[in-house]
Each structure stands twice: as structure tokens, then as C-alpha cells.
């Protein structure tokens, strides 16, 4: 009954905050799913839907006990956590995937400033195959992941030194027993959450490059790279071709969606190599809306 009351309240108020979430599984009542769908259709974007059959195995794969995983909750907007026993450090960083791709295509040059920013591994005109481009993209991601992890380590150290949280520590399991503040590893679970941003843009860009440059060879690498460097100022027809003639992520085109999934999985596997200063692991999240405007402001033209 409470679930339906929450849905009714959201339908009446249509507030953007606090975020309302709905956990579902294969035996969720059809009536509940339909009620949630009607409320989502009112335009507030809520309730957010969380699939237990995807979330619970993902949590246990990261060392969360089955009991705690089944009792998961959502912190902040969409980040997953457990009840009363974790410091997940959600939003420790946001990683601009499409910026890493831009630097891969441009030889490490920031298209907005013209200054060196990333690793010079070649550029679009020097990668003879799509596989070479992918290898360079992976290497660019690796470089910035290392830089990001180093920065996060400093931030976490300074939080522990300058901003301990004794009240929070008093209500998080294991902190009292360990005699440690939650910022120093007192919690039962100590995670660091990093959000990957602009997966759809990466999939769309790589799909366009793969199809037009490497497979069909209807667009030369030189022409496309020039268009990216000049923001398509003298290439409106090429921009139209990229927008309308190449399949896009999220439209049930398997090979395009697989590009997005591939780089999500790669980024997640890359994060698994790191450990935070509290003895815990890194885990990945995905943001699909909130960070796209500020992230997009820091990216040049994309394919």
C-alpha cells in the first residue's frame, strides 16, 4: 500500500526532488508496474526503476554479502548502497569518456584550446585499422584513469585529515568497533564510486567512424579530422551525414549498442585495478542525463 501512496504523491506533486525509486523483480505485480509507468508518463522522470535481478548480482560480484545486497538502497540520485554499513564515496569522480575519444582522434590535442592535453598516440589519419583506433582509445582511457585515481587518493586523504565525520561514523557499522572514523576506513564496506559519462556519444562516434571511414570508406580520415578540428564550419553536409545516415545508440541496432557496452565493460574492468586508501575497491556507475551539459561544454566537435 505504501508503494501506491508514494506513487500517488509523486503524481500529485511532480517534484524533481527527492528522487523516488522503485525496486522491481520478475514477480512484481503488473498493477504496480502499470501504476509506475503512468506516473513516469507525467513527465517528472520518476519513479526511477531498479531491477533487483540486475542490481543484486552486481553488488555481490563486488564483495557485498547476499544479505546486504538484497537489502540495497539508493543514495543521492541513483547510486547503489547498503544500509548503515558502507561508505560508497559515490561521485568520487566523473569520467568524460568522449573527451578521451576526442584526444585519441586528435593526437592528444584539446580541440577547444589547441593545447596538448592527452597522450599523443597518433590521430585518426594514422590509425590504419579500426582495431588500432580502439587500442589507442583504451590506452588514452588508461592514462586518464591513472591520473584520476591519483587525484581521488589525495581528496580522500584530505577528507580524512580535515573533514572527519564522527556523527556519521557513530551510526555506520564497524566504525565504533574499529575505533576509526568512516573517512579512515571504519565502515564495513569501503568503496569508491566513479561515474562514466557520455557512453551514448562514444558509441555514436565510434559507430560513425567504423562505418564511414573504415568499412564503407565513403569519408576519408583526413576529411573527418578536419571537420572535427573546425567544428564542421565548412562541412555541413558531412555533419548531416553523421547525424542522419549512421545508426545511433539506443535504437535496437545491435552492433552500435555493443560498442557502448564494450567500452562500459572496459572502463569497469579498468577501475577494478585500483584500491582506495580505506582498503576498498573502485566501482563504476553511469550517468545518462545530469552531467551531459557541463561535460559537453568541455568537448569539441564529435563524430
Listing of model-derived features with the role each one plays in the protein:
Residues 1-303:
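Conserved catalytic cores of very large enzyme subunits
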Amino acid at each position: 500500500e505504501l508503494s501506491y501512496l508514494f506513487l500517488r504523491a509523486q503524481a500529485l506533486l511532480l517534484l524533481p526532488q527527492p528522487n523516488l525509486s522503485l525496486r522491481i523483480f520478475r514477480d512484481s505485480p503488473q498493477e504496480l508496474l502499470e501504476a509506475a509507468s503512468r506516473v513516469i508518463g507525467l513527465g517528472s522522470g520518476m519513479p526511477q526503476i531498479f531491477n533487483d535481478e540486475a542490481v543484486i548480482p552486481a553488488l555481490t560480484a563486488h564483495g557485498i554479502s547476499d544479505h546486504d545486497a538484497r537489502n540495497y538502497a539508493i543514495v543521492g540520485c541513483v547510486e547503489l548502497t547498503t544500509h548503515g554499513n558502507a561508505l560508497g564515496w559515490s561521485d568520487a569522480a566523473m569520467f568524460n569518456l568522449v573527451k578521451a575519444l576526442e584526444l585519441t582522434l586528435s593526437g592528444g590535442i584539446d580541440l577547444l584550446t589547441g593545447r596538448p592535453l592527452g597522450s599523443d598516440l597518433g590521430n585518426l589519419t594514422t590509425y590504419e585499422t579500426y582495431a588500432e583506433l580502439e587500442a589507442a582509445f583504451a590506452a588514452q582511457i588508461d592514462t586518464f584513469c591513472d591520473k584520476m585515481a591519483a587525484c581521488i587518493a589525495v581528496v580522500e586523504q584530505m577528507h580524512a585529515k580535515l573533514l572527519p565525520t564522527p556523527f556519521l561514523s557513530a551510526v555506520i557499522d564497524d566504525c565504533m568497533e574499529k575505533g576509526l572514523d568512516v573517512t579512515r576506513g571504519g565502515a564495513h564496506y569501503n568503496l569508491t564510486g566513479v561515474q562514466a559519462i557520455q557512453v551514448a556519444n562514444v558509441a555514436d562516434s565510434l559507430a560513425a567512424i567504423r562505418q564511414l571511414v573504415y568499412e564503407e570508406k565513403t569519408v576519408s580520415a583526413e576529411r573527418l579530422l578536419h571537420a572535427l578540428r573546425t567544428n564542421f564550419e565548412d562541412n555541413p553536409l558531412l555533419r548531416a551525414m553523421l547525424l542522419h545516415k549512421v545508426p545511433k545508440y539506443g535504437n535496437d541496432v545491435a552492433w552500435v549498442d555493443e560498442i557502448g557496452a564494450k567500452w562500459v565493460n572496459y572502463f569497469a574492468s579498468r577501475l577494478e585495478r585500483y584500491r582506495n586508501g580505506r582498503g576498498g575497491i573502485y566501482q563504476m556507475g553511469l550517468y545518462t542525463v545530469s552531467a551531459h551539459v557541463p561535460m559537453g561544454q568541455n568537448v569539441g566537435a564529435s563524430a
